């Protein structure tokens, strides 16, 4: 189906994707990373078969990219013209309208198929050292069709990602995705981060158990990444923050 797969960005998500693909498919896995040392580490440790070069781009059937939002856009705009016609591209960025707005027409112009993607999995750590070949087991994989994709491409992607261990695939529009993710993911990080800003947080030892652990698990943010994600989805996130403030105010008044 996808004989050669390029994973761009070998951090937690990209590294886990590379490990999963290599372990569970017959695809040849190429890796690209902004820092050469990380790509060399991935080659030495086994998640990839080779480090991607411009010459190898023409051999790639599927690109999966796990960079920050603007870095993903910049990388794809630079490298789409190097890819063979008909290549399929899936990003793993946690916002979708921003991505589609910047990449849909460029994909059409380059003759490649761009599909927005978002694997609903992660850890409270970052980097290749924390990547796992089981990270996506049972998780949901969201696909956002674009004008450059087709039913055939989407069906192929759904089958391929299910073979990687995902529990289900979901299709939606970019707008639907961003509104739901503002609630299910981004708001949770905001609330968790705000919660531990209480002066009582430093005194929790001996007074905390499961509830505290659950609510604070995602409080430690990758500030650079999450700031960019929040700003790219500012309006839906602001609406969700307003909504929870309204409900908290109801509790306060009672």
Question: What residue ranges belong to the model's regions?
Answer:
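N-terminal Rossmann-like NAD(P) cofactor-binding module of classical short-chain dehydrogenase/reductase
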Residues: 63-64, 90
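Internal alpha-helical scaffold of NAD(P)-dependent oxidoreductase catalytic cores
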Residues: 133-218
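NAD(P)+-binding Rossmann beta1-loop-alpha1 motif at the extreme N-terminus of oxidoreductases
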Residues: 1-54, 58
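Rossmann-like NAD(P)(H) cofactor-binding subdomain of soluble oxidoreductases
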Residues: 77-129
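Short beta->alpha hinge that forms the Motif I/post-I loop of the SAM-binding pocket
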Residues: 34, 67, 92
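Residues at the starts of beta-strands that form the adenosine-phosphate
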Residues: 4, 28, 113, 140, ...
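Interdomain hinge/lid region at the active-site interface
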Residues: 203-254
